[in-house]
Amino acid sequence: MMTIREYKRAESLEEAWQLNQKRPNRVLGGMIWLKMENINVGTAIDLSGLGLDTIEETDEGFSIGAMVTLRQLELHPGLAAYTDGAVRESVRHIVGVQLRNLATVGGSIYSRFGFSDVLTMFLALNASVELYKGGVVPLAEYAQRPYDRDILCLLYTSDAAD
C-alpha cells in the first residue's frame, strides 16, 4: 500500500528537483510501478505540467519525454517506422491498454526493472537519458547506476542527444 501525505504539481524542473531531494518525497508518473511498493510518500511530485509528455522527431532520431505513456509509444507512427515496428511490438503485450495509458517511459526506465520490455528495447537502440542535473548519459550506463534523487527528463534514440 502506498500512502501520500502531500501532493505538489511542480511548476518547473528546478522546483521538482528541489522537492525530490527530501528523502520521503517521490516523483510521480503514471504511478503504476510505485503501486508495487509498500511506501510512505512525503510529497508526491507531479511532473505532468512540465511538457515532458511529447515525442519529437529530428534528423538524428527521437527525443521522448519522461511523461510519455507506453500507449503513446505504441501508437507513434514515426517510432514504428524508425524501429521497423519493434517499439510497438515491445509494448503491446504489456498488460492492457488501460495500464499502457498510465505507465510512463520515465517510470519504466527509472525503475530499471529486469522485466522491463521498455528498458530492454531502448538498450537495444543504444538510447541515452537526460537527467536534470546529471546531463545526458548512455542508457546502458544509467541502468547500472545506483538510484539517486535526480530527475529523468528525456530519452533519446541513437544520435538525437547530440
Predicted regions and their residues:
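C-terminal structural segment of proteins
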Residues: 1-158
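Conserved PLP-anchoring active-site segment centered on the Schiff-base-forming lysine
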Residues: 161
